[in-house]
């Protein structure tokens, strides 16, 4: 399973939802054009918005959209584990995870698949992420790479493949399900924060690799970020919504 290349028949998208806005209806319609199959894992959305999710799933049909419903917010880790397990049980080998408000740029999925196919360490590639472009403050996300036992360094590029990274975010990332099964699920007790970080570090510890393909782009908001000046430096602090 580890060294195969995903096709639309072996790849699906997993989106964790929680009280999505009305714009999610059109968003899901666009995503259905990018993916052959989408799993929605809903984390206790309110009843009025739950009806919209049900209608959307019924509109596209089970062959296109499968809805997993939790009666409360069980957290991002548990929801992802539910989606990953469903994918494995139904014969899928790879998943791409998305936040409900993240938008793949044109060609992101195909670019990730191509990058995986040509990756020099494909059999050990646990996570292949896109380059994140922040919507509110249009800039590329900087990633971290371990320089030595004690130091880390920024790994920045606009093109090409960034290898041996330490931390990526879940949204937009392509996961190898065989490796996920070997490593074990996301930590349910982490709920939301550091779910992706813990998984990546665990993968690295077990000899797997994390990479970013810069030409694959995902439009994403890392919380509510604002540009701030401090001691002559430009900072971008993140202010998360209390309903996360």
Task: For each feature predicted by the language model, list its residue ranges.
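Short, well-formed alpha-helical segments that are part of the catalytic scaffolds
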Residues: 14-36
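A conserved acidic beta->alpha catalytic loop
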Residues: 42-53, 72, 102-103
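Glycine-rich, basic loop-to-helix element that forms the pyrophosphate-binding segment
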Residues: 71-89
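Short beta-strand-to-loop acidic/aromatic patch adjacent to the donor-nucleotide binding site
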Residues: 92-103
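Conserved donor NDP-sugar-binding/catalytic core segment of glycosyltransferases
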Residues: 107-142
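Short, flexible, basic/aromatic active-site loop/helix in glycosyltransferases
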Residues: 145-166
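A short, conserved alpha-helix in the catalytic core of glycosyltransferases
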Residues: 173, 179, 183-184, 189-216
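Active-site-adjacent helix/loop segment of glycosyltransferases
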Residues: 201, 209-244
């Amino acid at each position: 399973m580890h060294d195969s290349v995903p096709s639309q028949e072996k790849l699906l998208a997993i989106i964790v939802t929680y009280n999505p806005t009305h714009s999610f209806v059109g968003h899901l319609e666009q995503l259905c054009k990018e993916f052959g199959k989408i799993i929605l894992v809903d984390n206790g959305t309110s009843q009025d918005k739950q009806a919209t999710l049900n209608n959307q799933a019924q509109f596209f049909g089970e062959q296109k959209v499968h809805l997993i419903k939790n009666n409360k917010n069980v957290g991002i880790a548990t929801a992802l584990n539910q989606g990953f397990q469903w994918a494995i049980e139904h014969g899928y080998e790879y998943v791409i995870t998305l936040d409900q408000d993240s938008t793949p740029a044109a060609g992101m999925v195909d670019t990730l698949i191509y990058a995986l196919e040509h990756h020099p360490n494909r059999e050990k590639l646990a996570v292949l992420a896109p380059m994140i472009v922040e919507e509110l403050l249009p800039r590329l996300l900087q990633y971290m790479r371990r320089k030595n036992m004690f130091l880390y360094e920024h790994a920045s590029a606009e093109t090409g493949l960034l290898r041996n990274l330490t931390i990526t975010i879940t949204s937009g990332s392509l996961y190898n399900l065989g490796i996920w099964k070997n490593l074990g699920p996301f930590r349910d007790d982490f709920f939301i924060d550091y779910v992706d970080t813990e998984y990546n570090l665990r993968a690295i510890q077990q000899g797997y690799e994390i990479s970013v393909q810069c030409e694959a782009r995902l439009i994403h908001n890392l919380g509510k970020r604002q540009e701030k000046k401090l001691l002559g430096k430009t900072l971008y602090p993140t202010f998360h919504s209390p309903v996360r």
